[in-house]
From Swiss-Prot:
This is Chalcone synthase 17. One of its GO terms (biological process) is polyketide biosynthetic process. Belongs to the thiolase-like superfamily. Chalcone/stilbene synthases family. CDD domains: CHS_like. Keywords: Acyltransferase, Flavonoid biosynthesis, Transferase. It comes from Phaseolus vulgaris (Kidney bean).
Length: 389
């Protein structure tokens, strides 16, 4: 007779969850940030709001973003004028777009990750899909399973409406799945399309305007598994430790509400302050067990909610400017793609590390941190261990 403890022992993997491949994708429509205010105020029939346009121009100039990618183009917006108004009923039109395009963009990223992984997709045992762009039943996880031709009995997890901390959430869940199911290979996909949040300007809702200056579309996919097969699977980063916490005294700091007008969001001015005030505690809990207190000695992947958050975190911790380079590069080239951002940054970091001939996937360093920040205010922390190149 086999005992339950023996069954549990046999079910568990031996090594830590490991990222085995990364893929990213964006829509083909690229938007230049320097000319975006002209386009945005024209397409939303708001050119008469000259003072607000100047304010929006300053927001775009200070955003540290050079370009973004958006599924919504002029043709689509002209066909859906209610999406261009500030608060017109438009949820049906938005939903019609995202329920199709979110899984499609996710598929593009997933195909790249599966190709890099080099294993047949039939070996994928679990699927985690995450999006804040629309909701549907069956969900985007089901649609992606069909689009990719995954096995019908793949174990699916659909995470809707998590917001910008979700890149950390999906890695935390993938780690638990990979380490507790021997031989599991988890496909993780974050896909975001701003069709749910795009709307015209209002001088009474400036936090909405901040979002119009920052948000972009993108999808990222990773494959996570423990005990990589030697010579066949190539590890990139090990997921060593994870945590999630709600920052104290942060109620209402970041809110999103799905309404007839689409997804509205509200930001308190002091979001960067709340993040920087709580980051030290999160780092201490993560790295004190490793006897690491010099946060310039680790590599950094932080959700680029906006330049002010990164600036205040750097200042609070005394980080060298190069620590946030990969993070700032992704913000500059793609904007804020919500949960997908940190996975884009992982991809950027391992590529640049290889190009520069560094010793590890983590800029030549051994240990690193990945942070997600989002509604709550919620902070996700992931301790990463890099792999020798």
């Amino acid at each position: 007779m086999v005992s339950v403890s023996e069954i549990r022992q046999a079910q568990r993997a031996e090594g830590p969850a490991t990222i085995l491949a990364i893929g990213t994708a964006t829509p083909s429509n690229c938007v230049d940030q320097s000319t975006y205010p002209d386009y945005y105020f024209r397409i939303t029939n708001s050119e008469h709001m000259t003072d607000l346009k100047e304010k929006f121009q300053r927001m775009c100039d200070k955003s540290m973003i050079k370009k973004r990618y958006m599924h919504l183009n002029e043709e689509i917006l002209k066909e859906n004028p209610n999406m261009c108004a500030y608060m017109a009923p438009s949820l049906d039109a938005r939903q019609d777009i995202v329920v199709v395009e979110v899984p499609k963009l996710g598929k593009e990223a997933a195909v790249k990750a599966i190709k890099e992984w080099g294993q047949p997709k039939s070996k994928i045992t679990h699927l985690i899909f995450c999006t804040t762009s629309g909701v549907d039943m069956p969900g985007a996880d089901y649609q992606l399973t069909k689009l990719l031709g995954l096995r019908p009995y793949v174990k699916r997890y659909m995470m809707y409406q998590q917001g910008c901390f979700a890149g950390g959430t999906v890695l935390r869940l993938a780690k638990d799945l990979a380490e507790n199911n021997k031989g599991a290979r988890v496909l993780v996909v974050c896909s975001e399309i701003t069709a749910v949040t795009f709307r015209g300007p209002s001088d009474t809702h400036l936090d909405s305007l901040v979002g119009q200056a920052l948000f972009g579309d993108g999808a990222a996919a990773v494959i996570v598994g423990s005990d990589p097969i030697p010579q066949i699977e190539k590890p990139l980063f090990e997921l060593v430790w994870t945590a999630q916490t709600i920052a104290p005294d942060s109620d209402g700091a970041i809110d999103g509400h799905l309404r007839e007008v689409g997804l509205t969001f509200h930001l308190l001015k002091d979001v960067p302050g709340i993040v920087s005030k709580n980051i030290g505690k999160a780092l201490f809990e993560a790295f004190n067990p490793l006897n690491i207190s010099d946060y310039n000695s680790i590599f950094w992947i932080a959700h680029p909610g906006g330049p002010a958050i990164l600036d205040q975190v750097e200042q609070k911790l005394g980080l060298k400017p190069e620590k946030m380079k990969a993070t700032r590069d992704v913000l500059s080239d793609y904007g804020n793609m919500s949960g997908a951002c940190v996975l884009f940054i992982l991809d950027e970091m391992r590529r640049k590390s290889a190009e520069k001939g560094l010793k590890t996937t983590g800029e030549g360093l051994e240990w690193g941190v990945l942070f997600g920040f989002g509604p709550g205010l919620t902070i996700e922390t992931v301790v990463l261990h890099s792999v020798a190149i």
